[in-house]
Regions:
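Extracytoplasmic ligand-binding site segments that recognize negatively charged/polar headgroups
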Residues: 1-117
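Ligand-binding "clamshell"
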Residues: 10-15, 133-145
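A bilobed periplasmic-binding-protein/Venus flytrap-type ligand-binding module shared by bacterial periplasmic
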Residues: 29-34, 74-79, 154-166, 184-187
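Extracytoplasmic/secreted proteins, especially bacterial periplasmic and envelope-associated proteins
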Residues: 44-45, 71, 75, 86-89, ...
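Periplasmic-binding protein-like
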Residues: 92-98, 105-106, 137-161
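A ligand-binding cleft/hinge motif common to bilobed small-molecule-binding domains
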Residues: 117, 123-140
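Mature extracytoplasmic/periplasmic domains
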Residues: 160-219
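Conserved C-terminal helix/tail region of periplasmic/extracytoplasmic solute-binding proteins
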Residues: 215-244
Length: 244
């Protein structure tokens, strides 16, 4: 595709097998209403999940089921001295730090809006786009960029082999990478463009992109080769030792 060269490097998958249609990051979402009422400062670190004041108010996505949960755990693991191929520090420290604060491990983020509205959830892993979507529905959420960095998250597309409309599929895939398509996705869906030439069509959309560029300065990229190889083992261990 001619637009390939215009994509962020992180949106260009190995060997051109796929391309990111939007980019984002997993950081910290929090209950703005609760924080305001209790006069708590906004979160600044992944280690805020271990703050005793959040006991029974942390909601964490399940590592085996959710990329957000995986991202949050791996950042905690890095802070404890681990790497993406060595999660011993994370598993060893979880039960004495974040674990006691967790109200519920959820399989997806679908329950978060209800749990925020009900005053159950104070703090949770989430993306800026996810937070913006909930805010647009009147849910009192805000996003905080952890000082240790957020984790890069890319939604990618590829055309499947031997489909019955290969030319149309390629045209659609190429269109979704254009500045035109991504400007619309940004304006109407808060989707952060992967095409660097996308021009935001409204001041609000421009503000979203400006915030994203700030977040990208400290974003972390996982070693997905190691993660994909080891994740089945982590899933089993998580289910046996964390989420029982």
């Amino acid at each position: 595709s001619p637009v390939w060269k215009d994509l962020y490097p992180s949106a260009r998958m190995a060997d051109g097998m796929a391309a990111g249609v939007n980019v984002g990051m997993t950081g910290i979402g929090y209950n703005k209403k609760m924080f305001d009422e209790k006069k708590w400062p906004a979160p600044t670190s992944w280690m805020d999940f271990a703050d005793p004041k959040f006991k029974g108010k942390v909601v964490f996505q399940s590592l085996p089921a959710s990329t957000f949960g995986l991202h949050g755990f791996l950042m905690f693991n890095r802070i404890q001295g681990g790497t993406d191929s060595n999660v011993e520090p994370g598993f060893a420290k979880w039960k004495s730090t974040i674990g006691p604060n967790v109200l519920e491990y959820i399989p997806s983020s679908a329950k978060l809006s209800e749990m925020v509205q009900n005053g159950e959830a104070a703090i949770f892993p989430l993306t800026p786009t996810g937070v913006a979507t909930q805010k647009a529905r009147g849910i009192p959420m805000e996003y905080a960029q952890p000082k240790e960095g957020s984790v890069l998250l890319t939604v990618a597309e590829c055309v499947t082999a031997r489909n019955d409309s290969p030319e149309l599929a390629q045209k659609l895939a190429a269109f979704l990478l254009t500045p035109q398509a991504q400007a619309a996705a940004l304006e109407f869906g808060n989707q952060i463009p992967s095409n660097t030439k996308t021009q935001p069509s409204t001041p609000a959309a421009q503000a979203t992109v400006d915030r994203f560029k700030e977040y990208m300065k400290t974003v972390k990229v996982l070693d997905w080769d190691a993660v994909n190889q080891l994740r089945p083992e982590w899933n089993t261990r998580w289910n046996k030792t964390i989420e029982r």
